[in-house]
A protein has these predicted regions:
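Short secondary-structure boundary segments
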Residues: 57-70, 74-75, 127-144
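N-terminal low-complexity or simple alpha-helical regulatory segments
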Residues: 1-71
Length: 172
């Protein structure tokens, strides 16, 4: 595993620049005045990317996607305080993941202040093989045919724990 990016961010424009280095063409816009204070971390693990983004101001992100990946976008917060958080027009709820269909060709989301976003980018082929090995046929169907899904709490926790582990403990 390799830490590709690990930095504090001070503007929405910086988010766009950092994502450009990953192959995204996106625009980020800060919705409140004042300096943004946030954090951006990306870890590469084999063919998988793991991203953690947090900001203290609301930020809208719009643009392209990485075509060879399915992305699992998860907002990590008490959803009572995350009422302005959404992806592709869908409001975040507990055990919810968005934007993973390989049919999506764009990213559109809004980060609420202090609601971290965790994204796991998994190669389509790896995702299919893992789902078949784990006998998670229902999850694979949801992933490949929907814009978002609410998972069973145990399955959601496994996804979040696995992604957070990769972000926080990358091995050399």
């Amino acid at each position: 595993m390799t830490v590709l990016i690990d930095t504090r961010i001070t503007s929405a424009h910086q988010i766009s620049d950092l994502c450009c280095a990953l192959g995204y063409d996106i625009t980020s816009t800060q919705l409140d005045v004042g300096q943004l204070n946030g954090y951006f971390r990306v870890v590469l693990c084999g063919k998988q990317l793991f991203l953690l983004l947090s900001a203290d101001k609301p930020v809208v992100i719009y643009g392209s996607r990485l075509a060879e990946y399915s992305s699992f976008g998860m907002f990590l917060s008490d959803f009572k305080v995350a009422h302005h958080t959404h992806a592709h027009g869908h409001k975040a709820v507990a055990n919810w993941s968005s934007s993973f269909s390989p049919l999506h060709d764009e990213t559109f989301l809004q980060l609420a202040p202090n609601v971290p976003m965790l994204v796991a980018y998994v190669a389509h082929s790896d995702l299919k093989n893992s789902a078949l090995n784990w006998h998670e046929h229902d999850a694979l169907h949801k992933i490949t045919n929907k814009q978002f899904a609410v998972f069973q709490p145990e399955a959601y926790e496994r996804i979040v724990r696995a992604a957070m582990y990769r972000l926080l403990y990358p091995s050399p």
